[in-house]
Amino acid sequence: MNLTLPMKKQKFLLIISLLILLSLLHQDYHIEAQNSDKVVNLPEQPLNPKISHFSGYVNVNQENTRSLFFWFFEALSESPSTRPLVLWLNGGPGCSSIGYGAASELGPFRVVENGTSLSFNQYSWVQEANMLFLESPVGVGFSYTNSSSDLENLNDAFVAEDAYNFMVAWFARYPQYKSRDFFIAGESYAGHYSPQLAELIYDRNKVQPKDSFINLKGFIVGNPLTDDEYDNKGILEYAWSHAVISDHLYDSAKHNCDFKSSNWSEPCNVAMNTVFTKYKEIDIYNIYAPKCISNSSSGASYLGFGVNDKSPAVKDWFKRVRWFEGYDPCYSNYAEEYFNRVDVRLSLHATTRNVARWKVCNDSILQTYHFTVSSMLPTYSKLIKAGLKIWVYSGDADGRVPVIGSRYCVEALGISVKSEWRSWFHNHQVGGRITEYEGGLTFVTVRGAGHLVPLNKPEEALALFRSFLNGQELPSSP
């Protein structure tokens, strides 16, 4: 009697059974993990519309127990299962994507004054996409590490690697989003974070196993720090052209500063320090908006850019020029009140042990951050050639990362113009200007918006975002 065939069949059936069992266990893990992340009974959450959201930690380094905190919102679209996934990053370095992006700008909930309640944001970007807000780098917001050396070694490469590891692990936890079109979005110093993460994903996709593949389609950045030379040149020219500084100060800075060099002369430092002191009476992030008057000990106290009126501290300019690119100080006060409530932290599954007090911006991150990359233009060139869709938008009332510098950066790429500079419209009014370039790059201005475009011009920001995602032209007529 030949028992060979039945034995082979038994082994085959055993293997199939084990694979099915492993698949079921894996599926159970996903369901259990997502259920544990689900946010229920968030204090002060509006009852309508019904919004499904999740929050928690993803470990990106087992050795140092380095964990990044996220807040994820499913799209409010009629078909959320078909909508893309968008990762949002705020800058600083050191500012929270939850305090700004999620709770003050484009998330579905906005913190109301004094952090006592939430209001529904009808112009939230969750109208168009599944939005994932990440507190990065480690040390920002609720994200934490058990190793102090992590905080001493932060630089752009470190941050990009952690963000990449986060996304790989997050997709393993939420596999239903793995095949979606994936975009990265952000503002300010995310002008570094976003393209660097995009580049890392692009490079890793070519060599990593299939289960680590990320379906990256492009990125969109607002008022982004891009190139030190052009950004700093733009700061000076914007301040002069918008009557913030005198002709004499402008001429002095222009004469003494070589913006191509990272080692500025003392006369240049003195001149540029003076430029920033002229902004102390107004809001540099939105020069036409009323200045928030607050005695809070939150991020609002940093608006002086570290300038000591009795001692210019010229040697500290390089840190000061990078001071938190992007916040409304009053909104940051409200966010700090809300996210330090014990009931809120418990609802969001945020640790109270590793993070004693949540801050909208962590100044120690800025002080220890190693600025090793002066220009993102080579990365832009690489990713444009790779075929990624890239949009740069700029609120034209921002004095910190002004539209002038961003225009210099885009022009320096040397890409042929596909569609000439024109106006775009929203609600029968000019929303801003737009230029399209060959290769998928688009530059858009938003009229009357400051550094935080979704906060200052929420309707226009949503229209712009919708156009970016859907590949639709912004209206060229009222």
From Swiss-Prot:
Chief location bin: secreted
Cystine crosslinks: C95-C361, C257-C268, C292-C330
Localization, UniProt: Secreted
Active site: S188, D398, H451
Annotated signal sequence range: 1-33
Residues carrying sugar: N114, N146, N263, N295, N362
Name under which the protein is recorded: Serine carboxypeptidase-like 33
Annotated organism of origin: Arabidopsis thaliana
Phylogenetic classification of the source organism: Eukaryota, Viridiplantae, Streptophyta, Embryophyta, Tracheophyta
